[in-house]
Structures are given as C-alpha cells and as structure tokens.
C-alpha cells in the first residue's frame, strides 16, 4: 500500500479546466467518500484551490489506483477522462510525499513562498478526517507536510520570494524604460490573484495610475479598493476591454494563468500607438502574453521565465546554496528522509508482529504436546517449561526484530545472505568481505591509477 497523488495545477492545466474541477466542501467530501469506495483505494484527501486540484490516496495497485481517481474526477467535473489525462500529473510513494511537502512549503505555488497553501492543506486534511477517509498513511503524510511547511517559513526567508520576483520585474522594466519610477505613467494590471496584487501594490508605490481588469470584476474591484486605501488612484475596466486599454497605457502587467493569451500580437498591432513606448510584463506560468508582441515597434516584453533566469544568474546566494529556495529544498529533503524512514519501519511492523505471533503459537503447541506426552508433570513444572520456552523465543526474536526495523529505516537494499546475517547477528566464516564504500576509489582515481600503471609499463 503506497500513497498516490493525481492532480493538476496552474503549471500543467489552463485556468478554465481547473475551474471545472474546483470543488466546494460538499463536493470535496462526497468525492473523497467515492474514492475510498473504489476497490483499489483505501484513503483519500483532496486539495482544491483556484490554482490546484490534487487527490491524495492510498492504493494497493498503481495503475488501478490512477484509473479509479481519473474516473471519479471525470464523473465530478463532466470532463472526459482522455482530456483529463493530458493535463494530469501523477506521483507515487516517496515522490508523492515529496510533492505534498513542496506544495505545503509554497515551493510549487504561482507566487513562490506564499503561506495560504498551508491553511488550504490543513483544511483539506480536516475535511477528509471528518469524512473518515483519512487513515494512518495520509495522516502521517499530512502531518509531515504541515511540519515541513512550518519549518520552511520559520527557518528561511522564502516568504519574500514572490515579492522579490515582482520587485525584480519592476527593476528590469524601469531599467529598460530608463526611469527611476512610474510617476505620471498608466499601468494596466490583468488579474486579481496574489502575483497581480503584488504588482499593483508595487506599481502604486512607484507612483503609477492603475487600471485593473479581471474576469471576475468583483475581484478587480477589491484590488482597486486596496489601492485606494493605500492612496493610489485605480480604475477598474471590464476584462474584455483589456486590448483597447493598450492605447492609453505605458505598462501592462499580466498575472492570470488564463487559458490562451491575455495579450496577443494582434491586440498590440491593432491598438498600440506606434510612437508610444509600451512595456509588457508577463508574470504567469503558463504564459499570458504572446512572445510575438515584442516584434512590434516600440514594444518591449519581459516574461517570468527570463526573469527567473536573470534572477538566478544574479543570485550569488543561490549559487552558494544559501538562498531561501535552496534552504527550503534542504528542509524538504530532510523531512522526506525522516518520513520515508518512518514509513519503512511502519511497513515492517506487521511482519514482525506476525513472526512473534507465530513463535507464540509454536510455544503453545510445544507446551500442549509436552503436557500430553508427560501427564506426570504437575502445574508448576508445566508453568516453568512454558516460561522457559517463551524466554527462548523472545530472546531469539529480539535481535532480528530490532535489526529488521533498523534495516527498514535504511533506504539501502541488502542481499538475502546479508539480511539473514544482519537480522540474527550472525558471523559466518568466509561468507564475504566487509567493504566500506567510502574507502573505494572513485572513477577519476581509478583512471589516474590506470594511467600511472601504463606509464610504468611503458
């Protein structure tokens, strides 16, 4: 039995499809119960946000488990299974655990380091627990993931990563525009999520006049209201008017993750005024703005992929492994190793229990046989024999029981011969040679030694 995650996010699927799979609490609970009623699934937890839909289950069969999850998602969303499969990703066993830890830490978010996802994972766990679809494996994974997320946010500065990206985008844009601020400039913001809100805040601080557009106008109005409260002038326009707005703005920033482009080359060709400089900034993955827009005269484009490359190239902390992102990845690795070790030990417990139960049954059988064969033995004598046999069985099994858990905790694999020696602490003459892998020469050392030998032979 292993943990399986089947899901999609802003990185793998268009927003329109994510919206079809989005689940409220009732649908989430019903779907969890439907999942565990499938023959291959025994536990289920669903994380549903505006940028992500992920189903965490425990399965006894990888392929059947994936099929059952996809079938249930198709039933709930009304989207054909074949279409779902083209956007879904699958992680299994330790890879599934690592994925949830990355998600909970904010390392897989559109705005890296955002903390809201911790609460969303906790809520998903609570919903599933209340429905009785959480068992020991998802419980252990959820607790490990939540602990990982807390560590990442308390021990690193990953919280600032998203704002750093937006800040860097503005630095790059201002540098190309030859300006120090945006005073007197009009900035179009497309989107109303975390990244778009950060962009609006930053543009406002630089003195820009904001124009906000979002598919849901109420969300655009909330962003504008926050700007007003900060003393920044902001208008709201209908999302369908975004292309026309290119006539009057100096900068357009898109952070929607929408299906298809929010700004196309045709939009720029039709509405951009040739003698007016236009800076376009794409903060979305997948991309919001068509790369072809940069071919138009007077138009410049910055996108998040180029920003990431430039930011990493300039980040000496990242190169040294001391950046918040690198530190966060190390924490995830530590927690994953701890979780995986605990799970391997937990997996061996049933076998150890079965071994002890078998030994106890053998003791009982031998005591019964002795009692039948020697009726002259009184109750005290039979008690002594029973206790003696139990002590022998306990002592014989103690070392292999302890060593079995130690071997399970170690992720390395061992041969059957080595396993027997390790379990029972056996020292067999001539059975093998103990080798410390750390003492073996690496490929470069072996090649150097071979070259030296050839020189001597020559």
Swiss-Prot record:
GO molecular function: glutamyl-tRNA reductase activity; NADP binding
Subunit structure: Homodimer.
Positions of substrate binding: 49-52, 109, 114-116, 120
Family stated for the protein in its record: Belongs to the glutamyl-tRNA reductase family.
Note: During catalysis, the active site Cys acts as a nucleophile attacking the alpha-carbonyl group of tRNA-bound glutamate with the formation of a thioester intermediate between enzyme and glutamate, and the concomitant release of tRNA(Glu). The thioester intermediate is finally reduced by direct hydride transfer from NADPH, to form the product GSA.
CDD domains: NAD_bind_Glutamyl_tRNA_reduct (cd05213)
Stated role: Catalyzes the NADPH-dependent reduction of glutamyl-tRNA(Glu) to glutamate 1-semialdehyde (GSA).
Record-listed E.C. numbers: 1.2.1.70
SUPFAM superfamilies attached to this UniProt entry: Glutamyl tRNA-reductase catalytic, N-terminal domain (SSF69742), Glutamyl tRNA-reductase dimerization domain (SSF69075), NAD(P)-binding Rossmann-fold domains (SSF51735)
Reactions mediated catalytically: (S)-4-amino-5-oxopentanoate + tRNA(Glu) + NADP(+) = L-glutamyl-tRNA(Glu) + NADPH + H(+)
UniProt domain comment: Possesses an unusual extended V-shaped dimeric structure with each monomer consisting of three distinct domains arranged along a curved 'spinal' alpha-helix. The N-terminal catalytic domain specifically recognizes the glutamate moiety of the substrate. The second domain is the NADPH-binding domain, and the third C-terminal domain is responsible for dimerization.
Domain of life: Bacteria
PROSITE patterns (alphabetical): GLUTR
Keywords annotated in UniProt: NADP, Oxidoreductase, Porphyrin biosynthesis
Sites annotated Important for activity: 99
Database matches in InterPro entries: 4pyrrol_synth_GluRdtase, 4pyrrol_synth_GluRdtase_dimer, 4pyrrol_synth_GluRdtase_N, GluRdtase_CS, GluRdtase_dimer_dom_sf, GluRdtase_N_sf, NAD(P)-bd_dom_sf, Shikm_DH/Glu-tRNA_Rdtase
Single Gene Ontology BP annotation: protoporphyrinogen IX biosynthetic process from glutamate
Annotated catalytic residues: 50 (nucleophile)
Originating species: Corynebacterium aurimucosum (strain ATCC 700975 / DSM 44827 / CIP 107346 / CN-1)
Pathway assignment: Porphyrin-containing compound metabolism; protoporphyrin-IX biosynthesis; 5-aminolevulinate from L-glutamyl-tRNA(Glu): step 1/2
A family per Pfam: GlutR_dimer
Protein name: Glutamyl-tRNA reductase
Gene3D superfamilies in UniProt: Glutamyl-tRNA reductase, N-terminal domain, NAD(P)-binding Rossmann-like Domain
PANTHER family linked: GLUTAMYL-TRNA REDUCTASE (PTHR43013:SF1)
